[in-house]
Amino acid sequence: SGGADGAPPHLELGLTGYREYVGTHLIDASERRALEDDGERDHGERGAHMANALGCEAVLVTSDGHAVLLRRSGEVATHGGLYNGPSGHPEPSRAVVEGDDKETRAVEAAARVRNELYASVLMETHEEVGVPLEKLKAPTLLGVMADPTGKPDLLFLVRTELDAAAVRECYAAGAEEG
């Protein structure tokens, strides 16, 4: 939540993974409806039994005002062949906190989750486009969006000090996932 009243956004997150996401979203329509109906009946929320892994996506803007789009492989499980910004998923393992004091752990975990959300969009941009991390500026959260299946993504604005030609060179030199 959060919004027009000026309150900061509030997200409630649980743990899930890509395999669970595929298992609850890329299934027969009747099976999906049954899961959604169960969620409505059991929890008053159609998406309660869906593994909606939180994604992150960047609108990468170059110093000369160009936005960078990537075409998704036809081999991926979802949205193959479509264009989007550098995107991926935060790594929950980077937000794990251990210790005995529950209150201290909760505060530290919240900070780690927040840091991971922002760090993951920079790492995905670096890995997919090849722009060095030191050439990327701090991300700005633009909002939250959902794809047609209900999977949520955080959308960030990420600026680079590189111009479009330099970004093309980074990409051509071999992004880590390219």
Short names for language-model regions:
Residues 1-123, 131-178:
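N-terminal leader/linker segments that precede catalytic domains of diphosphate-processing enzymes
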Residues 126:
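Juxtacatalytic substrate-recognition/specificity segment
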